[in-house]
Amino acid sequence: ISGRPLDEANPVLDSELILPHARARVAALQRPLSPSGFSFAFRRHRDKSWTLPLFIKSKMLTPLAAGLISFLIDGARTMLVAGTRSAGKTSLLGAMLVEIARNNRIITSEDTLELPVAQLRALGYDILSMKTRSVITGTESEIAADQAIRTALRLGDSALIVGEIRSTEALALWEAMRVGALAKVVAGTIHGDSPYSVFDRVVNDLKVPKTSFKATDIILIANTITSPSGMERMRRLTQVSEVRKFWTDDPLLEKGFADLLTYNAKNDTLDATDVLVEGESEIIKAIGSRVREWSGNWDAIWGNIELRAKIKQAIVDAADKTKDPDFMEAGFVVKANDEFHKLSSLVAEEVGYTDPKRVYSEWESWLKAEIKSKVREA
C-alpha cells in the first residue's frame, strides 16, 4: 500500500494507513533488525482536523494564544512548532492550517502523510499535498524533500507547510525564507523543547547558516505536562517566542529570543509576557507596519489580537451552551473565520477602521443566528 519496501534488505517501514473513517501513522520492523519477527507501532490520528477552539477546550492553549496564532498566520509569518515526541506538534500544525484563509493556496510537504489534507480539501481549500522520500525508509523513485520544496517555490504564491523538518529540506526551506521567495505563511514542525534547542538543531545538526535561521519569526513549543502522580500526561503549549534579528553568534546570550507567552505550571495557564502586553514584539509590530490603521498604533494591533481571542472563546462557549461539539470542528470554525474576515472588511469600509467592538457585535449576531439554525435543524 505504501509503495515502500519491507523485507530483510529494508527491515524498516515508516508509512501511513488511511481507511474510510480512520488514519494512522505506521512504523514496522522485521528481521534482521527485529530478531523476533514483525513488530508494528500505530499512532492513530483524529478522524477530523484539530482546531484552535478544540485545543482551548482541552486546555492545550488559551484563547489569547489562539488569537495570537490566528493574527500571526494572517500576517504571513514563518513559524515552527517544536516539542518532544507525542507533544501534539503535528496536531497543532493541522489546527493552524484551518486558520489560513481559503483564498490562499496551500502546499504541504511530508514524507509520511499526517496532515488533514483530505478533510481541508473537502471544506473548499485549494491544497496540494506532496509526498517526499523518507530519510529512513524512502526509495529512489520518491522525490527528495529539498527538491520538493524547490518545486513548491515554482508553483506560485502559496502557503508552505512542512510536516517535519529533519533533513536536507532545511537548507532549501531557510534559503527560500531568507530571500523572501514565500509571501504567505510558512510553517513546519521540528523536534526541540526550547527556542535555543531549535536553533541548535537547525544550525548545528541541519547545517543551516545562522544568518538564514534569522528568517524564522516565531517558535511555538508544545510539551507534555505530567501530573504529580506521574499517571496522567497532558499536552500543553508552553511557550511562544519570537526570533529577533539583531544578533550575530548566539541568540540566547545576545537576547535573540523574546518570549510572548510562557507557561505557568502552578496555575496551568499560558500567560502573556510584558514583551507582548506592552507592545515590544518586533514581529507583531512588523505585521502592523504593513496595515495602514495599525502602523504605529499598538492599541489597534492588540485590540485585533484580543478580538480574535474573544471569537475563539465564543465558539467554545457556543459548543458548551448547546452541548454540540460540532461548533468546534473545522467545518464551523472555517465558516466563523470567513465571517470574521468579511465583517472586518465591511466595518473598515463603513467606519474607516476595523473597530473590534463593532466587528465582534456583528459576528456575535451571526453566531446566534447559526446557533438558532442548528437548533431548528436538530
Named regions from a protein language model:
Residues 301-378:
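Terminal-proximal interaction/regulatory segments of ATP-powered molecular machines
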Residues 89:
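Conserved lysine of the Walker
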Residues 11-15, 24-29, 147, 205, ...:
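Glycine-rich, charged/polar anion/phosphate-binding loops
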Residues 65, 93-94:
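Motif I (Walker A/P-loop) of helicase-class P-loop NTPases
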Residues 17-19, 30-32, 44, 110, ...:
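Flexible glycine-/small-residue-rich
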Residues 1-75:
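P-loop NTP-binding catalytic core
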Residues 218-310:
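Conserved P-loop NTPase
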Residues 70-71, 76-86, 95-225:
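Switch/coupling sub-region of P-loop NTPases
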